[in-house]
Amino acid sequence: MIPVTSFAGKTVAVFGLGGSGLASCHALKAGGAEVIAGDDNADNLAKVAQAGFITADLRNVSWVNFAALVLAPGVPLTHPKPHWSVLAARQAGVEVIGDIELFCRERARHAPDAPFVAITGTNGKSTTTALVAHLMREAGHDVQMGGNIGTAILSLEPPRKGRVHVIEMSSYQIDLTPSLDPTVGILLNVSPDHLDRHGTIEHYAAVKERLIAAVQPHGTAVVGVDDIWSRTAADRIEQAGKRVVRVSVKRPLADGISVDHDRIVRASGGAQAEIADIGGIGSLRGRHNAQNAACASAAALALGVGRDILQQDLRSFPGLAHRMEQVGRKANVLFVNDSKGTNADATEKALSSFAEIFWIAGGKPKSGGIAPLAELFPRIRKAYLIGEAAEEFAGTLEGRVVYEISGTLEAAVPAAARDAEGSGLADAVVLLSPACASFDQFRNFEARGDRFRELVRALPGVTPVA
């Protein structure tokens, strides 16, 4: 845990008592603050009260004595409208911040030179965060990983000289971190997302840009420049004096890092040097993972990791569960769990990575469906449709892709396995990449992916892939 000493002797309101909120309560208390905790969910309030914290309906308290409101990132700050707790804080002149802001203040007070890598982007954040942490750990560093990837930042060990904090940040968390100052900031990409919370793509992109604009003066901004929003951000912060490393997987760069036929190449001053070859690394398959690997490599290089050891460390990366996770193999068939593919944009990356696909898709449908994937339909040998979206997806696939409505994973997995094994194809892939949310049949995408893995490994003759 990171004791938060910057509010010692003061009273702090904490609203939103999930994982990060509860961790904030503990960290503030450990640092000497008095904590008043609030939440719109009665069960969360009861849990925090059982942990020994004072709870209150923050609508009915005076805000004049609060030094700050620590807000969970899931609570609306601006759109569609500010949460009532935000309005109450602003009316009382109380600053509204998040748990990563508390971390930044502690780092500034106690270990300002401790390496801090912050990662954001519409897609690829978690994989890149895990990969940076893996590369730094394999290079012999003391590494703490957390943030949006799952472990609340204040639950990690405190910043200190030589300890590297690798932190995934959502746009909501960036909004709540005015003192953000990473040693290395990574912006992977920007595409329309979370506009219900940001209003416009312009505002969403501006929030993402804040992370790289906040890089310390001696630090490095790593920016994927294959979309207009990120490319413009890179130009703007470079003009402001920041050191920028541009990354592209779509075209060679005269100054920056590009990926050419699985080779990560750095160019500068007319010279080129190969950093690594990621061909054949299952956990980094696909162009999207090539971008993740290139950005992670750029961050590791900026922190002093030698180019000579990056190759072996990239190859040993195990990947993340539910993201192009290879879970089993039987004869000619590979089984891939991409349950995190919850929309067409994410599933496009999975379909682009294989040529002979037996595709399990469906769930709670997202706006736009799977029509944007039409160019990839020739890769699909057969589709197995599940959940609420099954009929809608069947209508899109009619006359273009052979399909069956399986209804459930329990029916889809053995059917896809049977057809793939009997196809005679040398590289058949049974791919779960639903292009849908999971909430019609599962608690979350993790539960859906876990069930897929269980069903695959229960099939006769399947060998788990470590």
Swiss-Prot record:
This chain's function reads: Cell wall formation. Catalyzes the addition of glutamate to the nucleotide precursor UDP-N-acetylmuramoyl-L-alanine (UMA).
Q: Which GO terms describe its cellular component?
A: cytoplasm
Please tell me the species this chain comes from.
Answer: Nitrobacter hamburgensis (strain DSM 10229 / NCIMB 13809 / X14)
GO MF annotations for this entry? Answer: ATP binding; tetrahydrofolylpolyglutamate synthase activity; UDP-N-acetylmuramoylalanine-D-glutamate ligase activity
Question: Lineage of the source organism?
Answer: Bacteria, Pseudomonadati, Pseudomonadota, Alphaproteobacteria, Hyphomicrobiales
Give the catalysed reaction(s), semicolon-separated.
UDP-N-acetyl-alpha-D-muramoyl-L-alanine + D-glutamate + ATP = UDP-N-acetyl-alpha-D-muramoyl-L-alanyl-D-glutamate + ADP + phosphate + H(+)
**Any idea what this protein is called?**
UDP-N-acetylmuramoylalanine--D-glutamate ligase
Which GO terms fall under biological process for this protein? cell division; cell wall organization; peptidoglycan biosynthetic process; regulation of cell shape
Cellular localisation: Cytoplasm
Q: Which residues bind ATP?
A: 121-127
Give the main localization category.
Answer: cytoplasm
Please tell me whether the keyword Ion transport is annotated for this protein.
no
Q: Which family does it belong to?
A: Belongs to the MurCDEF family.
Keywords for this entry?
A: ATP-binding, Cell cycle, Cell division, Cell shape, Cell wall biogenesis/degradation, Cytoplasm, Ligase, Nucleotide-binding, Peptidoglycan synthesis
Q: Which gene encodes it?
A: murD
Pathway participation: Cell wall biogenesis; peptidoglycan biosynthesis
Q: E.C. number, please?
A: 6.3.2.9
Q: Which InterPro entries does the record match to this protein?
A: Folylpolyglutamate_synth_CS, Mur-like_cat_sf, Mur_ligase_C, Mur_ligase_C_dom_sf, Mur_ligase_cen, MurD
